[in-house]
Amino acid sequence: MTENLNPREQYLGNPNLKKAFTSSEFTEDQIVELSKCIEDPKYFITNFINIVTIDRGLVPFEMYEFQERMVDTFHNNRFTICKLPRQSGKSTIIIAYLLHYVLFNENVNVAILANKSSTARDLLGRLQLAYEHMPKWMQQGVMNWNKGSLELENGSKIVAAATSSSAIRGGSFNVIFLDEFAYIPNNIADEFFSSVYPTI
């Protein structure tokens, strides 16, 4: 990251986040890159997403073949169930795809839900970290940014919460990511689907 935002362009003094409605001028190369990213989430993830690994710290995201297939599946299907072992990188690729989704679609709502609120917030935190390390010219300006939610200037929002029947009551969501759903007790899972299914 070589770009620097001046203090007036920063969201609440964070030098890694662009404030909403900050004017931007794009080079021809940047316009080409944006077009490629809009068309292909795998291109975006490979070229503009950084993740934290235990061994190497912050590094560019190098997808495995199964993660590329997951992205294709998400992008081409309304409903997807993934059954994968722990520590396989499933949550990381889903978070990367959700970042692409909110960045390049206007006025969409996304919920990240997990068996515990702390898990959901950790997932959102990983998405936020990836966002902060994107080039500023690619970022949407930030309207709201905290441990439980974010809102971008394009009107797209993400919320993180524990899975329960009341977790996202009253909202309509374009995408709901349910992590660790196997650990949700059956009675809560049933109530959750009864209240949430009509919203998607």
What are these regions (language model features)?
Residues 2-200:
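Phosphate/NTP-binding elements of NTP-utilizing enzymes
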